[in-house]
Amino acid sequence: MGNDISLIALLAFSTLLPFIIASGTCFVKFSIVFVMVRNALGLQQIPSNMTLNGVALLLSMFVMWPIMHDAYVYFEDEDVTFNDISSLSKHVDEGLDGYRDYLIKYSDRELVQFFENAQLKRQYGEETETVKRDKDEIEKPSIFALLPAYALSEIKSAFKIGFYLYLPFVVVDLVVSSVLLALGMMMMSPVTISTPIKLVLFVALDGWTLLSKGLILQYMDIAT
């Protein structure tokens, strides 16, 4: 019986793992920012989606490693087995405390409050008002309330970063368009001229390295 439960748990975890990585880690922010930068440069398929996602995954693994290591050490020290479901549930909940803290830290508090209240309302119905907690009093929100709040928060943050990264490239496009218009070269596509200029500037500034460092530094205190 224990082996059957272990197999079912392993299969369930393997099925959910890609979705957890894609929406429950900083991968969601990294991948969005990288794609937006590529579009801002005027490049369609270079670097390819596979390359960008691979780099985003590697950076995400680097950022999330302290949390994964702490969870691994906890499960190893506690000698968690799959024989007792109640015990397993307790150990999983305690072992994910580090991940829960990470989600709380990088999630919008209003979104956390919204999903937590929605979960309470679904659980208690009309009695929600009597058990509703203020957002400052939420000490240990549910993982199922934190995950959507975190994903939406990271998407919002990624689009903010992408907006600021887009601005200098838009300026280059406008300048090139104005110059071509002043020279009477209205038939020439501004993209033909602006794309090489943006590439030269981006490479000269070592843009990918600066961008990756800036994204990683946002999470450098999660191990503290």
Swiss-Prot record:
Membrane topology listed for this record: Multi-pass membrane protein
Sequence intervals crossing the membrane: 8-28, 55-75, 161-181, 185-205
Gene Ontology biological process terms, A to Z: bacterial-type flagellum assembly; bacterial-type flagellum-dependent swarming motility; protein secretion
Any one GO CC term of the record: plasma membrane
Location in the cell: Cell membrane
Domain of life: Bacteria
Alphabetical UniProt keywords: Cell membrane, Membrane, Transmembrane, Transmembrane helix, Virulence
Keyword Membrane among UniProt keywords: yes
Function: Involved in a secretory pathway responsible for the surface presentation of determinants needed for the entry of Salmonella species into mammalian cells.
Family affiliation: Belongs to the FliP/MopC/SpaP family.
Name of the molecule in the record: Surface presentation of antigens protein SpaP
Species of provenance: Salmonella typhimurium (strain LT2 / SGSC1412 / ATCC 700720)
